[in-house]
């Protein structure tokens, strides 16, 4: 992807395009890499996301706001935004990193996204960086449920199962499709105790696992109440008093 095409995706045009080029440069490519920009972008991102959360969720306290922000700026969340922007097509990697599939690595893509935020901050200041972050995050924030504090599907599924003392799910890659630079992964998620088996697809194993976990969570939340209801009914049946058989000796005495 050209720098011009990426700027169109970002909705921001750099006055100093070399900043964007540096933001896309991994340390394996050259000494003029993106790690300092990543450091800067991380701080700008945290501040801008905090500002948005403060305005959107007036009833959340400081602790809950911090937890929502942590889930929104963690590597997986940044990686998914980077995938949406197709940053893997614009990265500048060294030959070894390129051959090992570095353009698909979540850590590299997440770091590049933070570096882009840092580059925008240097290019035009905080307001421009905040506008970019808002553009990228508003679709995500509109789907955030304050009750779950922005946790991803795998975390929610794990916590739900643990809360009901059910063994954790199993994730298995069952297929990969497409060329190396545009692979699609297919993953199954199994919850043996509930006989749940669902499938998810994504541009990475993690993304496919998240998709499968979301489907599994929907199924599990339907099945667990039914399981609990049956369990309560069985316990009630076992504890209900059985009728006491008549005493034969007592019957004889009464007849006398």
Curated annotation (Swiss-Prot):
Residues 152-222 form the DRBM domain. Residues 3-125 form the RNase III domain. Belongs to the ribonuclease III family. HAMAP family: RNase_III. The gene is rnc. Its main location: cytoplasm. Digests double-stranded RNA. Involved in the processing of primary rRNA transcript to yield the immediate precursors to the large and small rRNAs (23S and 16S). Processes some mRNAs, and tRNAs when they are encoded in the rRNA operon. Processes pre-crRNA and tracrRNA of type II CRISPR loci if present in the organism. GO terms for cellular component: cytoplasm. Homodimer. Its EC number is 3.1.26.3. It is found in: Cytoplasm. Pfam families: dsrm, Ribonucleas_3_3. Mg(2+) binds at residues 38, 111, 114. Keywords: Cytoplasm, Endonuclease, Hydrolase, Magnesium, Metal-binding, mRNA processing, Nuclease, RNA-binding, rRNA processing, rRNA-binding, tRNA processing. Its cofactor is Mg(2+). InterPro entries: dsRBD_dom, RNase_III, RNase_III_dom, RNase_III_sf. It is an enzyme of class 3 (hydrolase). This is Ribonuclease 3. It comes from Cupriavidus metallidurans (strain ATCC 43123 / DSM 2839 / NBRC 102507 / CH34). One of its GO terms (biological process) is rRNA processing. Residues 229-256 are annotated as: Disordered. It comes from the Bacteria. The keyword Hydrolase applies. The keyword Kinase does not apply. The active site is at 42, 114. PANTHER family: RIBONUCLEASE 3, RIBONUCLEASE III.
């Amino acid at each position: 992807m050209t720098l011009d095409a990426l700027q169109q995706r970002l909705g921001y045009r750099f006055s100093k395009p070399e900043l964007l080029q540096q933001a896309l440069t991994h340390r394996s490519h050259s000494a003029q890499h993106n790690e300092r920009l990543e450091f800067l972008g991380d701080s700008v991102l945290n501040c801008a996301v905090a500002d948005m959360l403060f305005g959107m969720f007036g009833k959340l306290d400081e602790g809950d706001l911090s937890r929502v922000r942590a889930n929104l700026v963690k590597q997986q969340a940044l990686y998914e935004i980077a995938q949406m922007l197709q940053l893997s097509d614009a990265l500048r990697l060294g030959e070894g990193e390129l051959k090992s599939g570095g353009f698909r690595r979540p850590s590299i893509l997440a770091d590049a996204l933070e570096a882009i935020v840092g580059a925008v901050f240097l290019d035009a200041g905080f307001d421009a960086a905040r506008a970019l972050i808002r553009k990228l995050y508003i679709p995500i924030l509109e789907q955030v449920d304050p009750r779950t504090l922005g946790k991803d599907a795998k975390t929610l599924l794990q916590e739900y199962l643990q809360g009901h003392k059910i063994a954790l799910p199993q994730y298995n890659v069952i297929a990969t499709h497409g060329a190396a630079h545009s692979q699609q992964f297919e993953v199954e998620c199994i919850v043996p105790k509930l006989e749940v088996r669902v499938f998810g697809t994504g541009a990475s194993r993690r993304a496919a696992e998240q998709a499968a976990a979301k489907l599994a969570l929907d199924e599990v939340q339907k099945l667990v109440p039914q399981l609990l209801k049956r369990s309560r009914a069985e316990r009630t049946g076992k504890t209900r008093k059985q009728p006491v058989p008549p005493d034969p000796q007592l019957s004889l005495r009464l007849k006398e």
